[in-house]
Each structure stands twice: as C-alpha cells, then as structure tokens.
C-alpha cells in the first residue's frame, strides 16, 4: 500500500483545522458505513471468541482433562482473531494504543492538526525514553514485535501507517532540533508543505447581508 508522511507548517489562522477535518471526513465516513454494514457479523464473531475463551477456562479447571484437549482449544482460540470495529483514522494516540490498533486493523492513517502528538513517541509519557520504532517500521511494513511483562507478545507482520499532520512553525522548529527525531531519520521521511498566506484575499460564498 501507498504510505505518505506529510507535515504542513503554517501560522495560526491559516485554516489548518478545517483542511485536516476535510481530509479526515471520508475516512471517518467509510469506517462508519463499513461498521454499520458488518455490525452483526462483528458481534457474532466477538461472541464466538468469548464463548471459546469460557470453554477453555472451564476445561482448565477440570481434574480429568488431558493436555491434548487443552492444547486443541488453545489452538482453536489462537486461530480465531477477535473481531473489532474498523478504524482507519487515528488522532491523539499513545504507542501502546497504536500497537493494538494496528494489530486489529493492519493499516492506519494518523491525522491531526496538532503535531504535538508525536511527543507521545519521543518519551513524553515514558520517562523521556523514545519509542519511535513503530512509526519507523510502519513506513515500509517491517515486522514489529511488542513485548510487555503484563500481557502476551503482539507481532505485527506488515504494519502500514500514513501520517498527515499540521503544525505551527515553533512546533516544526522543535521537531527539527530534536536529536531523537533527527537521529532516527523520521523527519527525513516527511513531505513538507509551507503554504502561502491568503489572509486578506480569501473569497467567501456566503450571502451578503441585505441593506436595511
């Protein structure tokens, strides 16, 4: 799939938010329509997964159960991925949440009129320990493995994610001067846009106020 990372840099009042909202709208609408159309199938698959989990828990509590019986149910459960409602566009997301969303959806679009969300990956909530691996690997679909002590490992075989952000110049300066972003090569993967201001020259299609 095509992956593009774009960053628009503009001063306040450049209508960054309306433009980002316009870009995001069809993705939100498509996900909504798809989820509505497949809602019953999703709920059915979720119920089947929970039933199989309950069967496995009940089987493990039996005294006369064999290892083969447990292994068979575990295999069946591992082959049945839990269904979730489709997500395409994500906004303010943490690295941990992004792993789960990519596991469920495979491909995503990170889109926001605030590039400050990239601070989530530079260590804002992890004691200044950066976590850019997933952003880098989802650019070309490289396998990503998330190991956590409190849960099973998550393996993303081919994660893909495009990034579409807009920010003010001071945020852009902080990104350029961030050694983590520069050293990782992340900022070199973006296409940058510096729009020319049209303040004072904008045309509106609103009806004129009639004279009294």
Predicted regions and their residues:
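Phosphate-handling catalytic cores of nucleic-acid transaction enzymes
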Residues: 1-212
């Amino acid at each position: 799939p095509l992956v593009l990372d774009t960053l628009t840099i503009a001063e306040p009042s450049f209508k960054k938010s309306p433009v980002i909202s316009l870009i995001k709208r069809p993705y939100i609408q498509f996900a909504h329509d798809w989820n509505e159309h497949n809602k019953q199938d999703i709920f059915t698959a979720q119920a089947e997964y929970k039933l199989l989990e309950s069967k496995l828990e009940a089987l493990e509590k039996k005294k006369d159960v064999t290892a083969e019986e447990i292994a068979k149910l575990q295999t069946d459960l591992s082959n049945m991925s839990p269904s979730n409602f489709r997500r395409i566009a994500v906004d303010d997301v943490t690295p941990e949440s992004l792993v789960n969303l990519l596991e469920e959806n495979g491909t995503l679009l990170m889109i926001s009129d605030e590039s400050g969300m990239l601070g989530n990956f530079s260590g804002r909530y992890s004691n200044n320990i950066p976590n850019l691996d997933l952003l880098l690997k989802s650019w070309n679909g490289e396998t990503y493995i998330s190991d956590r002590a409190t849960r099973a490992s998550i393996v993303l075989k081919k994660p893909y994610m495009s990034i579409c952000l807009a920010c003010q110049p001071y945020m852009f300066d902080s990104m350029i001067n961030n050694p983590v972003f520069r050293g990782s090569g992340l900022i070199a993967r973006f296409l940058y846009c510096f729009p020319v201001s049209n303040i004072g020259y904008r045309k509106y299609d609103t009806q004129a106020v009639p004279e009294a």
